A protein has these predicted regions:
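Short acidic loop-to-beta-strand element that houses the catalytic metal-binding Asp/Glu
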Residues: 43-48
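Amphipathic coiled-coil/heptad-repeat helices and related helical stalk/stem segments
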Residues: 17, 42, 75-76
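Acidic-basic catalytic patches of nuclease active cores, encompassing PD-(D/E)XK
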Residues: 1-35
Length: 136
């Protein structure tokens, strides 16, 4: 029996982006660009528009049992500010993937190439910063 080839972190990330692109297109978004290699700390992985709105989409994908997470408050703020500079709304997509062939917890969490995956995606979260407090 041959050894299974595993997806790299970069391939898992790109897979999540591909999944989100399909979902966005189904929802009427026109995709302008998609870059799995974008600097994850400062730039969106997908840029699109719909009904006059520009959307910057920050995507994170993790293997079962996890879900993609933003790497801290500074990254969150950088993404929102970057979108704002371009007149765009900023959205976060957290995806989790599990090997459909996996029967055990370990097998579900192993990123094997060439198998089907179950996708966990609860929708987009609009990212925003709190309004500054006004003091008198």
């Amino acid at each position: 029996m041959s050894e299974q080839q595993l997806l790299t972190e970069r391939e898992i990330h790109a897979f999540g982006i591909h999944i989100l692109i399909k979902k966005l297109e189904e929802d009427g978004w026109i995709i302008e660009s998609a870059d799995p290699g974008a600097d994850r700390a400062t730039h969106p992985q997908i840029v699109g528009h719909k009904d006059g709105e520009i959307g910057f989409f920050v995507v994170r994908t993790a293997m079962y049992p996890g879900k993609g997470r933003i790497e801290g408050e500074e990254v969150f703020q950088n993404q929102v500010l970057h979108a704002g500079k371009h007149g765009a709304a900023c959205y976060f997509a957290s995806l989790g993937i599990a090997s459909a062939a996996g029967e055990s917890e370990e097998a579900k969490s192993t990123p094997v190439k060439g198998v089907h995956y179950h996708i966990s995606f609860d929708g987009l979260v609009r990212m925003s910063l709190p309004e500054p407090k006004v003091t008198h």
